[in-house]
Amino acid sequence: MKKNGILNKELNTLLASLGHTDTIVIADCGLPIPNEEARIDLALVKGFPPFLSVLDAVINELVVEEIVLAEEIKTQNPDVYESIKARMSDVPIQFVRHEEFKEMTKQAKAVIRTGEATPYANIILRSGVNFS
């Protein structure tokens, strides 16, 4: 058994497979997922696991060079938006309209579905490299 970090086999496999510029999505429970094969469904019940807990676990193990958020998160879910900014203050943010965000998810290697049930609690993470 792993000593610490992410225990989910599919999520570990995904993170280990990412190369530079690959993208993944962490999504609330309502975001449409375009490709069933690329879904890692962690949702257990409404609200669990929360988006921010999953984000924390992933960014603890992944080099992120850029994030993409829906523009609407700023006004429709300011608490989650501020929490993302606080956690990832050194990572550039690209903002797009929600419809464009949904189109961008089609290019992601996978969508990680959480139980989050607040609006626009979705993020695209672009993988960086761990070179010094």
From Swiss-Prot:
GO biological process terms held by the UniProt record: D-ribose catabolic process
One Pfam family hit: RbsD_FucU
EC identifiers of the protein: 5.4.99.62
Residues annotated as catalytic: 20
Enzyme type, top EC level: isomerase
Reactions this protein catalyses: beta-D-ribopyranose = beta-D-ribofuranose
Top-level taxon in the UniProt lineage: Bacteria
Entry-linked Gene3D superfamilies: RbsD-like domain
Principal subcellular localization: cytoplasm
Subcellular localization: Cytoplasm
Gene Ontology annotations for the cellular component aspect, listed alphabetically: cytosol
Protein role: Catalyzes the interconversion of beta-pyran and beta-furan forms of D-ribose.
Subunit structure, interactors included: Homodecamer.
UniProt-recorded name of the protein: D-ribose pyranase
Taxonomic placement: Bacteria, Bacillati, Bacillota, Bacilli, Bacillales
